Design a protein with these regions (language model features):
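Gram-negative bacterial Sec-dependent N-terminal signal peptides
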Residues: 10, 14-17
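Non-catalytic cap/lid and distal C-terminal segments of serine-dependent acyl enzymes
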Residues: 6-10, 26-333
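C-terminal segment of classical bacterial N-terminal signal peptides
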Residues: 17-26
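N-terminal secretory signal peptides that target proteins for export/translocation
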Residues: 1-4
Length: 333
């Protein structure tokens, strides 16, 4: 009898272990293999693959549906990683999907990627007035409201992302915006990363540079964003001036030197020239930001590479370099 009971116990133990082995990949797939509801019906599979869904989220603030590319966490974790685009963001796809395939980078990890589509020249902020000079077809930008209020509610309901357990990163314009959003909404973002962002926006010459960049990026009106040079909103949205709110958060800032490397050989001469100039400015402003942060006790990681232009070679490198820091802080391995 004892031997029989012992044999049955062994069989039960083996079956239990086998069920756990089978259940693990099923649980992982279960969070990813079904399309969530969205504001126009149901999300769609994105052609990039890697479980990315294209979802539309209604924005009352902007009066339209916003497309967001979302890769659910592998095992249903509640951490989110918001990934912001650059100045020339398109309405087709978030560049983090298209240019470096961030979905492939994080496919084996327990964090939900949140990649909003659109927002060209927006700095992901709430604009005071219609964004362009085309008054016959006004563009309403209320990206801060969307990213901090409207989108989190959707993500929590349909993807299980906590409104208070998020990281946010961005490149160039998106790096500036990521620092600002993390400072303005410290309860939402535990971590922020800026890759080649412009982290001082009100020093002499910065406003002129921004004005020219917005005009070049689609005839956007700088005064419609944060008002005139005398408007307090210009200073409230300067990463150099609002860094105090980042105390207690994990902060990562980076920039290249503007010196080309062999990785940049594939770029056309005019694109390399622009990449040199833009990255040198990003490097200068990020160093200023880092120096002040150090002096005022804002803990952060600063990475300045000896080579690197303002392009996807640099942005992709920084994403992969900082990936372990994201996963460690967000407990999302």
């Amino acid at each position: 009898m004892k031997n029989r009971h012992g044999l049955m116990g062994l069989v039960v133990a083996l079956l239990t272990a086998l069920s756990m082995i089978v259940a693990a990949p099923q649980a992982q797939a279960a969070n990813r293999d079904w399309l969530r509801p969205d504001s126009t019906g149901t999300c769609e599979w994105d052609r990039v693959g890697y479980w990315v869904q294209r979802c539309t989220v209604w924005s009352p603030a902007m009066g339209r549906h916003i497309t967001v590319q979302i890769q659910p966490a592998q095992r249903g974790g509640n951490a989110g990683l918001y990934m912001l685009d650059g100045l020339r963001a398109t309405e087709r796809t978030n560049a983090w999907v298209q240019d470096v395939n961030a979905a492939r980078t994080f496919v084996n990890h327990n964090i939900t990627l949140v990649m909003p589509v659109g927002g060209q020249s927006s700095f992901y902020t709430d604009w005071n007035a219609p964004a362009t000079y085309n008054f016959n077809s006004p563009v309403t930008y209320k990206w801060d409201t969307f990213l901090s209020k409207e989108l989190p509610a959707y993500l929590q309901r349909h993807f299980g992302v906590s409104p208070t357990n998020n990281s946010i990163l961005g490149l160039s314009m998106g790096g500036t915006a990521a620092i600002n959003l993390a400072a303005l909404h410290p309860q939402q973002f535990r971590q922020v990363l800026s890759y080649s962002g412009y982290l001082t926006t009100t020093i002499p010459g910065a406003q002129t540079a921004l004005r020219l960049a917005l005009l070049d990026g689609g005839l956007y009106n700088l005064n419609a964003m944060w008002g005139s040079i005398f408007d307090p909103r210009r200073y409230e949205n300067d990463p150099f001036l609002n860094m105090g709110n980042l105390r207690g958060r994990d902060v990562y800032v980076s920039a290249g030197s503007g010196t080309p490397s062999a990785r940049d050989d594939r770029y056309l001469p005019q694109h390399k020239a622009a990449g040199i100039a833009l990255e040198m400015v990003a490097n200068f402003t990020t160093r200023l930001w880092s120096a002040k942060a150090t002096a005022t006790g804002v803990k952060h990681t600063a990475v300045f590479t000896p080579v690197g232009l303002h392009n996807w070679e640099q942005f992709g490198y920084q994403l992969n370099r900082s990936k372990p820091q994201v996963l460690n802080v967000m407990n999302a391995w």
